[in-house]
Structure formats: C-alpha cells, structure tokens
C-alpha cells in the first residue's frame, strides 16, 4: 500500500486552500480599489483674492501656482472683454495650464435688493452668462438670488424665489442648448438650504443646480454639514470656507475662517461630498476677518426666518463648541491695502494646503 498518498492529498488540499484564500484576498483588494472614492477636484474662487483686483489672465497665473484644478471666476467684470474671441484666449490659457474655468455672476432676481442692471434685464444677464460659460467651456454659470435683506422685502423670500424661478424658466432652452447648468448659491443669508432645494425643483433640476456655500450656511443658522445633506444631490458648483461660531448674550456670532481653522470636520465633509456629488469640485472662497452677530434670542428675530427646530439645534450645538476669535486688523505701520491683500492670499493658500495635504483633495500634487 502506498502510504505517501494521504500525505500528498493533504498537501494538495492545503495548497488548494491557500490558493483560494489568496484569490479571495485579491478579490477583496480589487473590491477595495473599486470602492475607493474618486479624487475630488480642488479649486479657488476669485472672490477669495478680491483685493488684488486681478483680471482673468492674472487669476489663472496665480491659480497655477496653487496647483488647483478649477478656477471659479465669479463675476463678469474679471474679463477684459466678453466678446467670444478674447474669451477663447482665456480658455486656451486655462487649457495650457491644466485648469478648468467655471463662470459666474451675481443676482438674477429682478426684485432683489442686490440686483444690478449692469447686464440688462435679469433674463439678458442669464443669457449673457450662459454664452460666456459655453465659450469658456464651463459646465456651470453660478448666480445668486440676493441676500438676507430680501427676506424682509414685500412678499418676503417666497416672492423673491418666485421671481427668480420665472427668470430661470425663461432661459431654460438657452441653458439646455448651451449645455450649461445654472448654479444658484445660498448667498449672504438669502436662502435656507430647503428653500434653495425647493427653488431648484420648481425651476427644473434638469438645468438648475446648487452652488453650495458653507459660510453662508451659518448665516441662515444652519450646520454646513446639514446643508450639504440637503443640497448635495443638486450641487454642481461650490464656494466653501470654514466657520467659527460662538455664543453671545443675545444669540451667536459667526466669523468665517480658512479651512481647518473653524468648526467643520473636513474629513467627514469630504466623505459625504464624495458620496453625494463626487464630480463637483470643492472650490474655496475664503472671506475672513470679521464677525456677524445673530440675535436670535430676541423675540422679533425669527419673523424673517423659517425656523426648523431640528436644523437650528445643530447650529446651536456648533455655537456651544466654538469660541470667539479676533477680527482682522492691519498691522501698525503697514499699508492697509497691502495688508489686506496679504491676508486674503494667506487665508486662501492655507486652506488649499490644508485640504490637499490633510484631507487628500485635488488631482494635482
């Protein structure tokens, strides 16, 4: 009898089991690779360095030094010309630098306190922006309704939303023809996140989306993370920064900060961003150096806000965690304009560095 057969059989079965285990591990590795979230593009908004007064070409040169993927030029005044030929030159420069340009402008609500007639009627403004965006290769045209003051106007914010929706619907065919979506920002306390979501649904999410602003989230007394959960599925552009919030005798104060220097958990924020709107860039718009108090403990405060206790409770939790920080003040003996320029660049550059090195954002190294 061949007594070596059981030994060989055991060896064979052992080897087979090892191979199966190795194959299983490789399959798990492949699954992990498959499930690894895509890298999120990292960008800057030109408003972050507004004190520089740069035009598009200078903004692109600066953006290249930061190695960002996207430059949001959020106002039409930043171009030397809005004619197609000069805009194509801007696009060529951006392409050569490996930077995507996103186009934007300001209020398109004709009854907003922030609306200006620089670009004609609200509809003419939108159509101009769509043409600019298409020429630049921008997938979006970022706009705003207005500001918190609009909540106090006749008819309140609901009337301003209705007026904005009317403008958007009048421009639907042009947006679809251009292949450009209109991104509405929650801007300067004008819209709660749920109000912006309702505006988008009413106008038509096939051509309208959200430009989420984490700083302005705090100006409607919301947690930026909560705002992302509400608007994430609509988000096609962004203007982000951090928030420091702290309690005051009559409510809470909000001061915007560089990313990583406030209360936002950016690892968690980026993880949810990756799940909700992974193709949308995280664009930094630092606006820092001053605080605004919200006296929500006064009885007449809430008449202009849509109070939702569960949402407000999350804001209050942030206020309890935060602490007062000083406002920006130009150093003694330093030219104020130069100090402001240096301050703005510092806030933006620290934010980009933090999000790239600590959070892993951006396609470039």
Where are these regions (language model features)?
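Histidine-acidic metal/acid-base catalytic patches
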Residues: 2-6, 10-24, 28-41, 57-58, ...
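Active-site acidic/histidine proton-transfer and metal-coordination neighborhood
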Residues: 16-22, 34-37, 60, 93-100, ...
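Hydrophobic faces of well-ordered beta-strands that scaffold small-molecule active sites
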Residues: 40-45, 71-73, 101-105, 141-143, ...
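Active-site mouth loops of central-metabolism enzymes
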Residues: 43-55, 111-123
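Active-site beta-loop-alpha junctions enriched in small/polar residues
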Residues: 47-49, 76-78, 106-109, 146-148, ...
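Catalytic domains of carbohydrate-active enzymes, especially glycoside hydrolases
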Residues: 58-76, 137
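Glycine-rich, proline-tolerant flexible connector loops at the mouths of alpha/beta enzymes
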Residues: 72-91, 148-152
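Alpha-helix N-cap and loop-to-helix initiation/capping positions
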Residues: 81-89, 117-125, 155-163, 191, ...
């Amino acid at each position: 009898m061949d007594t070596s057969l059981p030994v060989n059989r055991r060896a064979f079965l052992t080897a087979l089991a090892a191979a199966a285990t190795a194959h299983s591990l490789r399959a798990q590795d492949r699954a992990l690779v498959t499930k690894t979230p895509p890298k999120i593009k990292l960008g800057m908004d030109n408003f972050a360095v507004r004190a520089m007064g740069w035009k598009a070409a200078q903004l692109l040169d600066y953006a290249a030094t930061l190695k960002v993927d996207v430059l949001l030029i959020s106002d039409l005044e930043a171009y030397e010309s809005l004619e197609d030929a000069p805009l194509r030159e801007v696009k060529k420069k951006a392409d050569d630098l490996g930077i995507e340009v996103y186009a934007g402008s300001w209020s398109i609500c004709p009854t907003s306190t922030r609306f200006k007639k620089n670009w004609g009627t609200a509809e003419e403004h939108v159509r101009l922006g769509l043409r600019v965006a298409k020429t630049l290769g921008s997938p979006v045209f970022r706009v705003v309704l207005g500001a918190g003051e609009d909540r106090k106007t006749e008819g309140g914010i609901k009337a301003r939303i209705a007026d904005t929706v009317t403008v958007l619907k009048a421009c639907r065919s042009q947006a679809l023809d251009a292949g450009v979506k209109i991104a509405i920002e929650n801007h300067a306390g004008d819209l709660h996140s749920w109000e912006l979501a309702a505006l988008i649904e009413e106008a038509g999410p096939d051509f309208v989306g959200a430009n989420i602003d984490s700083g302005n989230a705090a100006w409607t007394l919301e947690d930026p993370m909560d705002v992302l959960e509400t608007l994430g599925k609509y988000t096609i552009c962004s203007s982000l920064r951090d928030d420091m919030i702290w309690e005051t005798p009559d409510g809470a104060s909000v001061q915007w900060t560089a990313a990583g220097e406030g209360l936002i958990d950016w690892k968690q924020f980026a993880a949810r961003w990756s799940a909700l709107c992974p193709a949308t860039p995280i664009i930094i718009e630092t606006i820092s150096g001053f605080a605004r108090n919200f006296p929500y403990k006064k009885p007449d405060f809430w008449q202009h806000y849509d109070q939702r206790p569960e949402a407000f409770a999350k804001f209050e939790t942030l206020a309890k965690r935060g602490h007062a920080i000083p406002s920006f003040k130009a150093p003694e003996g330093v030219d104020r304009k130069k100090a402001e320029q240096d301050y703005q660049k510092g806030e933006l550059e620290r934010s980009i560095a933090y999000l790239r090195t600590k959070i892993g954002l951006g396609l470039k190294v």
